[in-house]
Amino acid sequence: METFLFTSESVNEGHPDKLCDQISDAVLDACLTQDPDSKVACETCTKTNMVMVFGEITTKADVDYEQIVRKTCREIGFISDDVGLDADHCKVLVNIEQQSPDIAQGVHGHFTKRPEEIGAGYQGHMFGYATDETPELMPLTHVLATKLGAKLTEVRKNGTCAWLRPDGKTQVTIEYRNDGGAMVPERVHTVLISTQHDETVTNDQIAADLKQHVIKPVIPEKYLDENTIFHLNPSGRFVIGGPHGDAGLTGRKIIIDTYGGWGAHGGGAFSGKDPTKVDRSGAYIVRQAAKSIVAAGLARRCLVQVSYAIGVPEPLSVFVDSYGTGTIPDKVILELIKKNFDFRPGMITINLDLKRGGNGRFQKTAAYGHFGRDDPDFTWEIVKPLKQEKALPA
């Protein structure tokens, strides 16, 4: 039986790039909560003792950017210089301007256009992917790497492993079998965890605690065997972390945000962007399309691409690849997708309810993945029943 290895990684909410993603989306949430028509393009960067938010925002909302920055950092656990950043005493810089009027008139006619007329906020192409290897219809490498990171944060915050600090990375390598284009996980080959820790803990305790409290609850026993390799803090020391260890920037973890290297990626980041930015809304709708195809049993794997021109509502192209796993031809799947999904940005916004902020809705997406999440705020994860005008060919 021929197999191959594939690897996906994840990073914790305390990783400096992910800190920036969460701040950018916390700003988006604050704007949308007060003004659902806010136009937001918010970037964040951070380094030792400093966080800066900058970009273009047009909103009627009254937003205290500094308060959002400090609150987000505090909730993640950056409460002293020892852990990499002090939320209450770091410098917060703000440089926010209004959206360019040239972009505004082209995209939404300065709010005069009907939803179906709203153009894409930018050009680009986005991909959605789904696979039947997990209940989430997501790649297992990505699911496990992401869940390991989330579990690290859980046992840090609940005190199970009090030596943990906010920053950390995880990575999982799985041995797969190709079953006619579908991916079948056989076993976990390697587990890698590098986590920030305090000065007092020993490497032996780190390894023991990670195996007992993080790996064991997350990775199903059937995937582990005597040959599974564990690299647990292989560098030997990870005390300095967060923005003190590395600079952070919004939009630098786009593969972690999506499918862990599976499928494809158009290159656009998500966080800090309102739904007129098709980098985000376009990627959400094609995930729903791909997931709905796999959930309907029409393919075991599915990739959907959509592309846009700035100011133009209709997509330039829609593409489907079932990797040879389709029960019907790809061209029939494509027609089914076109009939059931409206890819115009204004209609995506309505159908997925993307103007609704609050409840930390978009901030939640900014750590531990935008897809495969069981949360009613993740409306793009809802499987859509596919209406067929005529019986599908056998």
Curated annotation (Swiss-Prot):
CDD domains in UniProt: S-AdoMet_synt
Binding site for ATP: H15, D167, G168, K169, S235, G236, R237, F238, D246, R252, K253, A269, K273, K277
Compartments it resides in: Cytoplasm
Superkingdom classification of source: Eukaryota
GO cellular component, one term: cytoplasm
E.C. designation(s): 2.5.1.6
Protein's GO biological process: one-carbon metabolic process; S-adenosylmethionine biosynthetic process
Keyword Protease: no
Chief location bin: cytoplasm
Binding site for L-methionine: E56, Q99, D246, K277
InterPro entries: ADOMET_SYNTHASE_CS (IPR022631), S-AdoMet_synt_C (IPR022630), S-AdoMet_synt_central (IPR022629), S-AdoMet_synt_N (IPR022628), S-AdoMet_synthetase (IPR002133), S-AdoMet_synthetase_sfam (IPR022636)
Annotated positions binding Mg(2+): E9
GO molecular function list: ATP binding; metal ion binding; methionine adenosyltransferase activity
Cofactor note: Binds 2 divalent ions per subunit. The metal ions interact primarily with the substrate. Can utilize magnesium, manganese or cobalt (in vitro).
Keyword list, A-Z: ATP-binding, Cobalt, Cytoplasm, Magnesium, Metal-binding, Nucleotide-binding, One-carbon metabolism, Potassium, Transferase
Cofactor (UniProt): Mn(2+); Mg(2+); Co(2+); K(+)
This protein's pathway: Amino-acid biosynthesis; S-adenosyl-L-methionine biosynthesis; S-adenosyl-L-methionine from L-methionine: step 1/1
Catalysed reaction equations from the record: L-methionine + ATP + H2O = S-adenosyl-L-methionine + phosphate + diphosphate
Family statement drawn from the similarity comment of this UniProt entry: Belongs to the AdoMet synthase family.
The protein's role, per its UniProt record: Catalyzes the formation of S-adenosylmethionine from methionine and ATP. The reaction comprises two steps that are both catalyzed by the same enzyme: formation of S-adenosylmethionine (AdoMet) and triphosphate, and subsequent hydrolysis of the triphosphate.
Subunit structure: Homotetramer.
Protein name as it appears in the record: S-adenosylmethionine synthase 3
Organism annotation: Picea sitchensis (Sitka spruce)
